[in-house]
From Swiss-Prot:
Cross-link Tryptophyl-tyrosyl-methioninium (Tyr-Met) (with W-103), where in sequence: 225-251
Cellular component, GO annotation: cytosol
Protein name in the entry: Catalase-peroxidase 1
A GO BP entry: hydrogen peroxide catabolic process
Listed Pfam families: peroxidase
Cross-linked residues, Tryptophyl-tyrosyl-methioninium (Trp-Tyr) (with M-251): 103-225
Biased composition (Basic and acidic residues): 1-11
Positions of heme b binding: 266
Length: 751
């Protein structure tokens, strides 16, 4: 069993061992306190213009055009090399502190759901600003304030927090792979599940044989990665290697990238543990007194800074030149034999057995003092693990290979959550990488509105049904994740492995649709005398739009679904199957698709999916109702299809769900299904899942459903469905972005 108390008292990579915050028990009760299992829709209503102090038409990309990036870089270098008395720089250089800040901002990214990362500047807000692993990074951000003040909205906090670390490496002699700006700020914290624990450094996220719960990547609450003293504070390098491999894999890093990142990260800087945190270190920023003005971890030991700093229970530097890029980390790791020791704070770390290592490392604040190098348990993992060891030795023998591997892995770490390369800004954007899911540029003339109308008629006359067209377009577009901006219809990767074989996409049905659409594509492109072409990606979306128009026509509404050509088709060689599989939905409530092994309830999975698709609660509501009427359920199930006219875009889902003549009960045959019983006849009228019934049971969702169920809600339902559908179809179309809230789209008349 993990000794949590011991872990809390001494452990982290750069986190103080401090007590967990004490909950305030006298605060007013919220609905969540009374009904903890209630579906919380607030996650769908964050980051609106109501929380943003900037004008609604503010466009960060436009503001960035006025930024002198070279001047900003020089200002950063000047700042890094000018030590300030209120928080002295180790070795006279803040570079390592800024690298840790950037690393910890980006390093919260997890590949399972794309959440975390540095793309929004979330390190400024709770809980991340007060995580024990982020201790004293409040000072790093405060050091940056004069530059943020100087450049204003031309550079976002999100970009500045990441760029500072990149510049820091360059200032210490390392040639980085490049850098992309383009991270707009948000103004409130993201509501993310960081783990089940209610204490700092708790590790209730494990079960069985140290199996880490999904989607989590870090090993303990409040750590960015792993415990540097080893699992649960146990200084076992091989056991630590297992944690490292699992955690970094869940951050989308392979073994070589992992070794390079750890080596490169520990080539500069030092850890801080001049004394035990208990009795010396104060509250984190969110709990600190108001007069501290957002700074936390006030230290009463000695001067409280410099040589007396307490950030971790660990103390010491890894290399002989802690502000210079070199191969010193690996040289020391392999040169010396290491023995277990403790820091002044009592943390478990390692020192050389070799006496010649004494006095080889300069003191961070006193020229007359010297030290021996220090290694952490997780550092020794790189030497002792049978997989990491040979990689580290190769890097030791070939420093140029380390530099290349670290440059690319560092770039990947900083940009993993930014999505396609087209979102990057600035002059230092390198060539496309496979992990960016590259999509070819448009190299042909796009179809006209007349072509679009003709193609829609051809699609609707091809024998493909409305449900088939809707399901295919939705499967392509709704693979998008607003967290790390991956997925979407652009690229037509739904026709490629692994997406074409996902159970959620019904492979045999999908193959039929794709074959028909490819035939239409070939016929159209082959008939053009000029350079005009239509991509399969565009046809997939256009087919869905045509199907929506046809279903609306059947309901008596002559509507036009916006469509903007310009998507292109990616190749299998441009698709990394190993990292693309994480986009496969565990469940898709919009199509009433769920897996038995899913730990989340259908209604919770619905909320999670809506959050990934950047939908509001009204948009989520109207899409579910519309998808049911379009008969787009997975496996053509009838659950939630409350109509005798499937394929017609009517508001009957809401009308019949809210019909007080129907009583609902759990099905005896299937516990995941509910039966709607006619109160008069006792006969079964409908079947549904929890993802359907939640719109009648949840008070907020019922209020939304009532709007569309009203007699005057029919046209509103169709109009709002089309708007929400268009949003989903274009979530990945960054080429269409005008202002922050606007998109340009070519509209076409319905058939």
């Amino acid at each position: 069993m993990t000794d949590k108390q011991h872990t809390r008292s001494v452990s982290e990579s750069e986190n103080p061992a401090i007590p967990s915050p004490t909950p305030k028990v006298s605060r007013p009760r919220r609905n969540k306190d009374w009904w903890p299992n209630q579906l919380d829709l607030s996650v769908l209503h964050t980051h609106s213009h109501l929380s943003c102090p900037l004008e609604e038409e503010f466009d960060y990309a436009d503001q960035f055009k006025g930024l002198d990036v070279d001047a900003l870089k020089q200002d950063l270098i000047q700042l890094m090399t000018t030590s300030q008395d209120w928080w002295p720089a180790d070795y006279g250089h803040y570079g390592p502190l800024f690298i840790r800040m950037s690393w910890h901002a980006a390093g919260t990214y997890r590949i399972a759901d794309g959440r975390g990362g540095g793309g929004e500047g979330q390190q400024r807000f709770a809980p991340l600003n007060s995580w024990p692993d982020n201790a004293n990074l409040d000072k790093a951000r405060r050091l940056l304030w004069p530059l943020k003040k100087k450049y204003g909205q031309k550079v976002s906090w999100a970009d500045l927090l990441i760029f500072a670390g990149n510049v820091a490496y360059e200032s210490m002699g390392f040639k980085t792979f490049g850098f992309g700006f383009g991270r707009p700020d948000v103004w409130e914290p993201e509501d993310i599940f960081w783990g089940p624990e209610d204490t700092w450094l708790g590790d209730e996220r494990y079960s069985g044989d140290r199996e880490l719960a999904k989607p989590l990547a870090n090993v303990q609450m409040g750590l960015i990665y792993v415990n540097p003293e080893g699992p649960g504070g146990n200084p076992d390098p091989l056991a630590a290697a297992r944690d490292i491999r699992e955690t970094f894999a869940r951050m989308a890093m392979n073994d070589e990238e992992t070794v390079a990142l750890i080596v490169g990260g520990h080539t500069v800087g030092k850890t801080h543990g001049a004394a035990p945190a208990a009795g010396n270190v104060g509250l984190e920023p969110e709990g600190a007194p108001i007069e501290e003005q957002g700074l936390g971890w006030k230290n009463k030991f000695g001067s409280g800074k410099g040589s007396d700093a307490i950030t971790s229970g660990l103390e010491g530097a890894w290399t002989n030149n802690p502000t210079k890029w070199d191969n010193g980390f690996l040289e020391n790791l392999f040169k010396y034999e290491w023995e277990l020791t403790t820091s002044p704070a009592g943390a478990k770390q390692w020192k050389p057995k070799n006496p010649e290592a004494n006095d080889t490392v300069p003191d961070a604040h006193g020229a007359s003092r010297r030290h021996s190098p220090t290694m952490l348990t997780t550092d020794l993992s790189l030497r002792m693990d049978p997989i990491y060891g040979p990689i580290a030795k190769r890097f030791h023998d070939n420093p140029d290979q380390l530099e290349d591997a670290f440059a690319k892995a560092w770039f990947k770490l900083l940009h993993r959550d930014m999505g396609p390369r087209s979102r990057y800004l600035g002059p230092w954007i390198p060539e496309a990488q496979l992990w960016q899911d590259p999509i070819p540029p448009v190299d042909h003339e796009l179809v006209s509105e007349q072509d679009i109308d003709a193609l829609k008629r051809t699609i609707l006359g091809s024998g493909l049904s409305v449900p088939e067209l809707i399901s295919t377009a939705w499967g392509a577009a709704a693979s998008f994740r607003g967290t790390d901006k991956r997925g979407g219809a652009n690229g037509a990767r739904i026709r490629l492995a692994p997406q074409k074989d996902w159970e959620s996409n019904e492979p045999s049905r999908l193959a039929k649709v794709l074959t028909a659409l490819e035939r239409i594509q070939n016929d159209f492109n082959g008939s053009q005398s000029g350079g005009k072409k239509v991509s399969l990606a565009d046809l997939i979306v256009l087919g869905g739009c045509a199907a929506v128009e046809e279903a609306a026509r059947k309901a008596g509404f002559n509507i036009s679904v916006p469509f903007a050509p310009g998507r292109t088709d990616a190749s299998q060689e441009q698709t990394d199957e190993s990292i693309f599989d994480v986009l496969e939905p565990i469940g898709d409530a919009f199509r009433n698709y769920f897996r038995a092994e899913d730990p989340l309830s259908p209604e919770t999975r619905l909320l999670d999916r809506a959050n990934l698709l950047k939908l509001t609660a009204p948009q989520m509501t109207v899409l579910v109702g519309g998808m049911r009427m379009l008969d787009a359920n997975h496996g053509q199930s009838r659950h939630g299809v409350f109509t005798d006219k499937p394929g017609t875009l009517s508001n009957e889902f809401f009308v019949n769900l809210l019909d007080i003549g129907t009583a609902w009960r759990p099905s005896v045959a299937d516990k995941s299904v509910y039966e709607g019983i006619d109160r008069t006849s006792g006969k079964t009228r409908w079947t549904a899942t929890a993802a359907d019934l939640v719109f009648g049971a949840h008070s907020q969702l019922r209020a939304l459903a009532e709007v569309y169920a009203c007699d005057d809600g029919k046209e509103r339902f169709v109009r709002d469905f089309v708007a929400a559908w268009n949003k989903v179809m274009n979530l990945d179309r960054y080429d269409l972005l005008g202002t922050r809230n606007g998109r340009r789209a070519v509209t076409s008349k319905p058939v």
